[in-house]
């Protein structure tokens, strides 16, 4: 996104640290897993392309906050400051990523109400800053109990409010994860629901 659209990205990761995110980004550029990158390392003939990839990624304008559990007010405040700073530099904030929604701090009488408020607050951030927000979410364990493992809207963990607040809900499904003998290896299917 950052490279294609020439816009900056703010990532709020409450589960992974910056180093792990960077490892995954670098590994994806080489078509390997971050585990392979750590275990096998970089072969001699890949050192130069590896260093070029690191330089390229570091210049893309990807800002990562890995402080842990943040409130939506803290996310909004950070994004507002970043957007102002980028505007002074003649740059633009083009995307906000929250990984993941259920780890945001919130107060409510039930967990379902907390998550509903977080989803609404993230929607409000997108609207007030005029920047799309991608909020990652966990699925409930119920999907594992079904024969058909393809995700559905009802599988969003803890609340239907996530789908109510979202403009688009997209799921990733890999058939090979559940069916070892599949003829659809290394293909991902995206299930998309557009909500208004």
Please describe what each predicted stretch is.
Residues 4-92, 106:
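Cytosolic-facing regulatory segments adjacent to core modules
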Residues 10-13, 63-66, 97, 135, ...:
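Structured core elements
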Residues 14, 42, 101, 138-139, ...:
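Short, ordered loop/turn segments at secondary-structure junctions
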Residues 2-3, 127:
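Anion (oxyanion) recognition and catalysis
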Residues 17-21, 42-50, 71-75, 97, ...:
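Helical mechanochemical/support elements of P-loop NTPase systems and associated helical scaffolds
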Residues 4-9, 59, 93, 98-101, ...:
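Active-site lining segments that contact anionic ligands and/or coordinate catalytic metals
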Residues 80-81, 89-135:
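Helical hairpin unit composed of two closely spaced alpha helices linked by a short loop
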Residues 114-196:
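Phosphate-binding/switch region of NTP-binding enzymes
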């Amino acid at each position: 996104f950052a490279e294609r659209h020439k816009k900056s990205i703010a990532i709020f990761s409450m589960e992974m640290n910056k180093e792990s995110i960077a490892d995954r980004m670098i590994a994806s550029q080489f078509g390997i897993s971050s585990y392979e990158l750590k275990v096998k390392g970089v072969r001699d003939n890949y050192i130069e392309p590896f260093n070029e990839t690191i330089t390229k990624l570091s210049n893309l304008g990807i800002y990562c906050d890995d402080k842990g559990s943040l409130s939506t007010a803290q996310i909004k405040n950070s994004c507002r400051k970043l957007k102002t700073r980028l505007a002074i530099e003649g740059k633009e904030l083009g995307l906000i990523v929250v990984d993941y929604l259920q780890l945001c701090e919130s107060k409510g009488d039930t967990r379902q109400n907390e998550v509903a408020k977080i989803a609404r607050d993230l929607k409000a951030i997108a609207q007030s800053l005029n920047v799309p927000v991608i909020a990652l979410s966990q699925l409930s364990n119920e999907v594992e109990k079904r024969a058909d493992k393809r995700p559905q809207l009802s599988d969003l963990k803890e609340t239907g409010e996530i789908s109510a607040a979202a403009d688009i809900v997209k799921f990733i499904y890999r058939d090979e994860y559940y069916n070892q003998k599949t003829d659809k290896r290394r293909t991902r299917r995206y299930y998309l629901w557009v909500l208004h």
